[in-house]
């Protein structure tokens, strides 16, 4: 396959996120991968050792589970709470999960798949502060960031604060929003 990523790629990504989401990304922050799932797996491998714990908010995209298990890590479920018309984060339970010294990573699905929930800046900030306090790195799968209904606004997790930016990894891809997964 091709190993060189053209300069235009980096310009397209940085320009898109600046225009669409008000997030100014430095080119040096971008690492091209073949997709979000391989990126998530590689990040888990880089940030954990076998036996560490990875927090997920269930229900969640099933590939998260294999990415965690394939790296020898333990899955820690922080179930979302179902209300009459949506899902909500259980922050008290998240605090308990993150307080475990073996918890090293939290996989955040933003917007959430399969719940379709677009997290608010306040919810993301609360989640981020819990993870920061406990030394847990947030790995944000934001592949669905362009698939947001009118009236809702996607917020990139890492854009909320410098502390979050420096203690997180954001994974994105145009494959879902633009139906181009076959181009990989």
List PLM regions with ranges.
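N-terminal small-domain helix-loop-helix segment of the aminotransferase-like
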Residues: 1-35, 42
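Short acidic capping loops at alpha-helix termini that bridge into adjacent secondary structure
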Residues: 25-30, 50-53, 165-168
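Conserved PLP-anchoring active-site segment centered on the Schiff-base-forming lysine
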Residues: 46-68
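A short helix->loop->beta-strand "cap" motif at the edges of active sites that frequently abuts
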Residues: 52, 73, 133-137, 165-166
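Short beta->alpha connector loops at strand-helix junctions that form conserved
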Residues: 58, 77-82
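A short helix-loop-beta submotif of the ANL/AMP-binding
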Residues: 70-76
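Active-site phosphate-binding strand-loop segment of PLP-dependent enzymes
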Residues: 81-152
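Active-site PLP attachment segment
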Residues: 160-184
């Amino acid at each position: 396959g091709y190993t060189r990523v053209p300069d235009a790629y980096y310009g397209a990504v940085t320009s898109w996120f600046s225009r669409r989401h008000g997030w100014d990304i430095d080119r040096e922050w971008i690492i091209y991968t073949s997709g979000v799932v391989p990126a998530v797996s590689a990040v888990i491998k880089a940030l954990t050792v076998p036996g560490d714990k990875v927090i997920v908010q269930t229900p969640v995209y099933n590939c998260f589970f294999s990415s965690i298990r394939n790296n020898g890590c333990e899955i820690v479920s922080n179930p979302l709470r179902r209300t009459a018309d949506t899902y909500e984060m259980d922050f008290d339970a998240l605090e308990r999960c993150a307080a475990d010294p073996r918890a090293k990573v939290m996989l955040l699905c933003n917007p959430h798949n399969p719940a379709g929930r677009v997290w608010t800046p306040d919810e993301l900030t609360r989640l981020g502060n819990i993870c920061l306090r406990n030394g847990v790195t947030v790995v944000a799968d934001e592949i669905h960031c362009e698939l947001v209904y009118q009236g809702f606004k996607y917020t990139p997790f890492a854009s909320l604060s410098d502390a979050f930016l420096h203690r997180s990894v954001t994974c994105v891809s145009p494959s879902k929003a633009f139906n181009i997964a076959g181009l990989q």
